[in-house]
Structure formats: structure tokens, C-alpha cells
């Protein structure tokens, strides 16, 4: 096939645009889960099928988060091997932001579940030859108010960026988060 390669590829971009709204509609409409803002399917190397990120409003109850994690994991048999719940301030396309959320907002004993008896689905040969795989669900959402992000606020950073550019210094490439913001505390 001309469009089947290791992701990102033409086919994975097309699938992502098609699948993400379908997953979102499944969680919101079919399952009636409140607080779901967005569903993102991780593309580079995983090819959309293995890692799913569900973005929630800050005030979403824990019960709704777990309903969505299970719902995303089992909606489509070959998708959702790893499902991560995050809040709106986390960019699901930024692996550093996801790792930060997992490191600071997740307690593995309370916020991680592993589920067995998952089919392997389509993909490259695995390390083991068995028929079964497993699922990993992670709640990396805020469990309460947190201190503000330890960076100057947006007006200060924007002014600093303007001064930087006025001085003719090398072009900046800001990455989120590039300014501090309130996390409720």
C-alpha cells in the first residue's frame, strides 16, 4: 500500500482526523460521560492505535474520569492499549507535558489500573508470541488545587519576548508552558 508506513504517515493523519471525533462522540453521547473536552490519539511511532489521551474539565468527578478511561480502552478493540486522563492545561501532543502530568498529578497506587485479556490487534511483531496483551489506564488529572506554575505570568513573558526580539537576539521557539498560570491554589 502506498500510504501504509510507520506513523506519522498519510494514512495515520487521515485516521486521526476521523477517529478522534468518533471517540469523543462515543464518550460524550453514547456513554453520557460528563466533563470530556477532547480525545487525542498519539501518532508518532504508535500509529494512533496504542495510546489514547482523554482531556477533562478541571471539575470532572473521579467517577466520570474512570468511566471514560474504561470506555476509551474498550471502544475499539485495536485502540487504547494505554489510556491517559489529563486536564485542559496539558497539551496531549506534547510528550513532556504528559510526563509532567504523570509525574506530578498521578499516584500510581491510586491512579493506575492494569487490565488483562486484551487482544494484540494489528501492528508489528511483539516481543512475546502470545495472543493476549493488556491495558494500562492512568488518571493524571489534578486531584485538587495546586500551586501556580513556577514561571512568570503571560504578560511578563510576552514583554520579555518583545524585548528579546527588539534586541535582535536569535529567534525564540516557545514551548508550552512558556508562562506561569494558576492551578487553583
Protein language model features and the residues they cover:
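Charged, compositionally biased interaction regions
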Residues: 1-185
Amino acid at each position: 500500500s502506498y500510504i501504509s508506513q510507520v506513523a506519522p504517515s498519510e494514512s495515520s493523519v487521515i485516521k486521526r482526523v476521523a477517529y478522534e471525533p468518533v471517540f469523543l462522540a462515543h464518550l460524550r453521547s453514547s456513554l453520557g460521560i460528563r466533563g470530556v473536552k477532547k480525545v487525542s490519539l498519539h501518532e508518532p511511532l504508535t500509529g494512533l492505535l496504542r495510546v489514547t489521551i482523554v482531556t477533562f474539565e478541571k471539575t470532572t468527578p473521579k467517577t466520570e474520569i474512570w468511566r471514560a478511561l474504561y470506555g476509551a480502552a474498550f471502544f475499539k478493540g485495536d485502540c487504547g492499549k494505554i489510556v491517559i486522563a489529563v486536564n485542559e492545561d496539558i497539551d496531549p501532543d506534547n510528550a513532556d507535558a504528559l510526563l509532567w502530568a504523570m509525574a506530578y498529578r498521578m499516584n500510581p497506587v491510586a491512579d493506575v489500573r492494569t487490565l488483562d485479556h486484551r487482544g494484540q490487534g494489528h501492528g508489528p511483531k511483539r516481543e512475546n508470541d502470545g495472543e493476549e496483551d493488556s491495558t494500562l489506564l492512568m488518571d493524571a488529572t489534578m486531584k485538587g488545587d495546586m500551586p501556580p506554575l513556577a514561571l512568570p505570568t503571560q504578560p511578563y513573558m510576552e514583554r520579555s519576548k518583545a524585548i528579546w526580539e527588539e534586541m535582535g537576539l536569535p529567534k525564540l521557539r516557545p514551548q508550552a508552558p512558556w508562562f506561569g498560570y494558576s492551578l487553583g491554589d
